[in-house]
Amino acid sequence: MTLGRRAPGFASSGSGRRGYLPRDLRPPVTIFEEHEGEIERALGKLSKHVPFAEAFAEGAVGEAIRVDTRSTAVTPAPRLSGVVFRVWTGRLWAEAGSSSFAAKELDATVERLQAEASRAGGTAAPPGESMTTQGTWVTHPKRSPRDLGTEGVIALAKDARGWASAVPGIVEVQARVQWEEEQRLYCNSAGARCRQTTMRSHAVVIPIALENGRAEFDYWNSGGVGGLEAVADFDEESVREAALGSKALLQATAPPAGETTVVLDASVAGLFAHESFGHGTEADQFVRDRSYLKPLVGQTVGPEFLSIVDDGTFPGGWGTIFCDDEGHPAQKTALVDHGRFIGALHDRETASVLHARPTASTRRSNFQCRPFVRMTNTYVAPGKHTVEELIAEVNDGVLLERGTSGIEDPLGGQMQLKVKRGHLIQHGKVTELVRSMALSGKVLDFLRSIRGVSRDPLTSIQPGFCGKGHSDYIPVGTGGVHLLARAIVGPA
């Protein structure tokens, strides 16, 4: 799976038109208030015929604004909404969904699922514990993009374009500002009823520099749960720094190749935590014997000063949730605790099979997709050293910055991380700027090579999207601090 540092979820397109008409952007909570009774009635009807039944309903609204030097595009988030019912037949799980909340359609969906459950048969109790959590959670943005309106958000994006364009040598700027408000409703026959309304806001600015026919770009990227206040440092200084970074990359040299000492910045350490290590801790991989980490639970995999966490409660984190899609309240789960791999991420079924406890890690991409064990916000916890102390330890190496993507291998334990830029480190000093590169190798070898973790405070989470296979994309966050280690690097 690739963790994309791309804009969240909405494909931008358009023709630069002006005079935008008002859109129907009712919050999904309004949609569900009209139909929750019908969903619960249908669930009650279904529950009379199976050992366990649950319903998951989902809907979202939002907008993506994209501006460049030639056009302005406004793209509404896909108005996808619907409900899926899932039952334990006594032998297996079965589910059926509907994109309509009309009573007739819900009844037809339930009857179809009821017939399937009857054919499947079985007398066993459902695996794991059925949750009884009840609650309503709502994101209350301090600076809602709704209040600005479409024209106000366009003005923000144009401001960012202007800040970057003012830097000499910048020939193109892509600026995107987008938000989405999503409601999820989970209820089951054991009594759980969880409704969560979550707003996520995100912005990215990509200035492109051109010299002698060669183009380069750096970027600025920020987002989180909340309104525009969750887009930290969305200001002229940050955008101008990205534009200057694009220009500087035109003069950057090729990165080193081969095994060397590396320092990972916070964005790259976060990519490592999620992509290279985190996917191997998703316990559905354990059940299928497809994770190299399965036999290592309880063992030391890294130095005593290394801890890796998945945290669905991180304040304002891009992957933060209130509860998962089986009704488990969000939690903070330690994966590596002081160098020891202490456990995996679980849904109710994997927890039952592996004699563990669920970790609020069951997430659906939407009502049309299956539930899977997924991450939320995954990061390397702060350590003991300053960044300067880590750099001073390096005689000849490279600092990797601006993580862009990664590829994981949960079965074989191999990894590859790509970064946009870096700097050489020579005799304990950061020196020459180098172009994009990739870090690769075996995850366990990299973990054992870690010699230092910086203590800089973890104040923000980088936004990204992660798929399970080639689809099922969900918002996930990554973060961390600086790591000092050994790895193989080369041009990307």
Spans of model-derived segments:
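N-terminal small-residue-enriched
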Residues: 3-11, 17-492
